[in-house]
């Protein structure tokens, strides 16, 4: 995906700011604008949490277990495991712990609050061989918040992004062993960011609000060689977002000590052109390929696995184009595009999970996973996407209230491991370090079968 910020002077403002790309160190936060997610949820800025039942087994076997409707998202071919007409709704709450300390001892925690990741699915069996499904999910999203006066404010202060995905799918049961599925994703992104902005010798800050629509596609295949063994292969395409927005620049504190936006009074006569600008940003979300397997070892025990590849190597930089670069620099020949460099690599997720059926009403499950971060060079880690490798530990349960209604519950702990430093991208000098990059995920959902 991509996000770009266009800017035009506020009427009557003809003064100029002697700043160039410093104005948009703010783009570190904007990286999330295109699709976004917090590093604590999944590698890069992608959310995995589209199923509470799946959460309990660390998403092993996603889309082909058949115990909820999330096949609509993970692998549409798996809808053939869902008889009749069914409906699902639920949410995962993500609680982050992003404790950071700079070299000078300034501390903060970017965890904003508990962030909901909702899901809603509908499936309908049209005949013996065809199924239709529709899903509404938030596959990308994040929320971080640092105090405005923290030392590394130019690495990002506040960021909140949500991407809503509307995903119709169809599935065809070719025979008893092979099924295929396909769908289209229509996505809406809304993003809000704040970052510190150097303004001459003073300290200012900028705020971006942007939104936009884009679309992509998904495919899935499920192969069942025996009654107890299934494999799935699913693909989700790259999605390119073009988001229009508004950027406001201002001094961090006005004469009264209160943060200001617009054109602060304390800049009069200093040659600063602070105000509101139109903007546009673009960014590409990656291709994703997922391989899953599930085996009914006994009538009570199911074992599942997942391997997921995400093409984050395609996310090399975040280009931001704006006439404001020329206006603020006071140079009509300077570039109107700034690129925030990331130089990511492809990432991988590996998980294993188990389900144990205690009786007709209760199933319990657990899972473990290891996720490889897309951050290839640690000096390109940002405060708003503080990504690192992570370990998954999950537990969950399903309660079948009756033959029509079930409730699913899940809990996961994600532990960030490896390098957690923040660095100067030019010199490589370490500026600070995250003491923690952890998350707790708690989810609940229900599934209702109409017939």
Annotated model-derived regions:
Residues 96-98:
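A generic, lipid-embedded transmembrane alpha helix
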Residues 15-41:
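Gram-negative bacterial Sec-dependent N-terminal signal peptides
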